[in-house]
Regions:
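Charge-dense, helix-prone N-terminal extensions
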Residues: 1-119
């Protein structure tokens, strides 16, 4: 494994802490897909890298702001639906990605789970 492993492990632990969050690998062993609930609703995709990247959904306004940052780009295949990909190469990027994962969970989770996550 690379030096990026601790960052990937920290992102994985963060994503799995939300209510009814689970990990799946529908795109192969190198893509850690985080889903919410019993269905197939994704809220984040982690690639261990290097570099570690995370793909997630944002609101239109947040997406516009995020895309101004040098470590964020439109996600391949799903970018037109509001998804972006961020490379985690330093601490500020890591902190921003954690907040964006939280936002993506909020956007994708059923209402009852959203309320329990923030109560």
């Amino acid at each position: 494994m690379s030096g990026a492993e601790p960052q990937a492990d920290a992102i994985r632990a963060f994503a799995l802490r939300f209510p009814a969050a689970r990990e799946d690998h529908p795109f192969g062993p190198d893509a850690h897909v985080f889903k919410v609930g019993d269905g197939s609703t994704m809220f984040a995709i982690l690639s261990d890298g290097p570099p570690v990247t995370v793909t997630f959904k944002l609101t239109r306004e947040e997406r516009e702001v995020a895309l101004e940052l040098p470590f964020v780009s439109e996600a391949r295949y799903v970018g037109r639906y509001g998804w972006v990909t961020a490379s985690i190469e330093d601490e500020p990027a890591f902190d921003a990605v954690c907040e964006w994962i939280r936002e993506s969970y909020w956007l994708k989770a059923p209402k009852d789970l959203r309320e329990s996550a923030w109560s």
